[in-house]
Amino acid sequence: MFENNRVRIAMQKTGRLSKDSIRLLTSCGVKINLKQQKLIAFAENMPIDVMLVRDDDIPGLVMDGVVDLGIVGENVLEEELLKRKSQKSECSYITLRRLDFGVCRLSLALPVNTIYTNITCLKNIRIATSYPHLLKKYLDEKNISFKSCMLNGSVEVAPRAGLADAICDLVSTGATLEANGLREVQVVYHSHACLICKTGNINSIKKEFINKLMTRIKGVIKARESKYIMLHAPIKQLEAVISLLHGAERPTILKLAGDDNRVAMHMVSSETLFWETMEKLKLLGASSILVLPIEKMME
């Protein structure tokens, strides 16, 4: 049984988001023994219980108030939302934050030898998908009639098996499509992982802890997006150097022993530092340029 003051989080047991969800909780300091054969895991150091479930069960568990939080792909969330709206079922939730993983897109794909010029080429064809409601919404907006073929997996084999003329499925790199003789022709929906929360009554103890967890999640994501930069620069070129680096705050400037014309500069950069930027810094006279990852960050 769950204790009333423990926060219940639903996340994918196995699959695309599982490892990244675990890594996020671990980076937030949650000590939890996650075993794949168990459906429920309990944190050792925080009031958190994790339910390990199928990804398409997560939105419903949150909307029905079974769990407090859920980590789920926006594509799965939107599909469940559209399904529940069509059934006039409970579908309330709050999106607390879009996360920095689980990036993909739901796309239409055709066999490579099929001619495609625009969206009207899809009229009246049979399309295999695991996301019938997202597909219907998209094609209805384009006034495209079609026949749906619902599949829960291995959607990409449908054209070869004679089940459908096209597919609508998740794409990350496109390698799976290519391996099955398909090509992407139209993006239907862009998706990230997100953290959602149930609506309704959440007691003050849970609310306080969820706010604390959100602060940690924000810090973890901010740290991943940032780099700690250290370098030496000529005083005369200092402002030019700073203008190349987009920092969270103004840099720390330190004197260099035995050199009155140069200073050491430390700063947190909120953007990826590319080789081109480092080469520009070098041309401005910067030296000893170090770019370091940040493990944790709190503003």
Curated annotation (Swiss-Prot):
The lineage of its organism: Bacteria, Pseudomonadati, Pseudomonadota, Gammaproteobacteria, Enterobacterales. GO terms for molecular function: ATP binding; ATP phosphoribosyltransferase activity; magnesium ion binding. This is ATP phosphoribosyltransferase. Keywords: Amino-acid biosynthesis, ATP-binding, Cytoplasm, Glycosyltransferase, Histidine biosynthesis, Magnesium, Metal-binding, Nucleotide-binding, Transferase. Disulfide bonds: none annotated. The keyword Glycosyltransferase applies. It catalyses: 1-(5-phospho-beta-D-ribosyl)-ATP + diphosphate = 5-phospho-alpha-D-ribose 1-diphosphate + ATP. Belongs to the ATP phosphoribosyltransferase family. Long subfamily. PROSITE patterns: ATP_P_PHORIBOSYLTR. It comes from Buchnera aphidicola subsp. Acyrthosiphon pisum (strain APS) (Acyrthosiphon pisum symbiotic bacterium). Equilibrium between an active dimeric form, an inactive hexameric form and higher aggregates. Interconversion between the various forms is largely reversible and is influenced by the natural substrates and inhibitors of the enzyme. PANTHER family: ATP PHOSPHORIBOSYLTRANSFERASE, ATP PHOSPHORIBOSYLTRANSFERASE ATP-PRTASE. Catalyzes the condensation of ATP and 5-phosphoribose 1-diphosphate to form N'-(5'-phosphoribosyl)-ATP (PR-ATP). Has a crucial role in the pathway because the rate of histidine biosynthesis seems to be controlled primarily by regulation of HisG enzymatic activity. It is found in: Cytoplasm. It comes from the Bacteria.
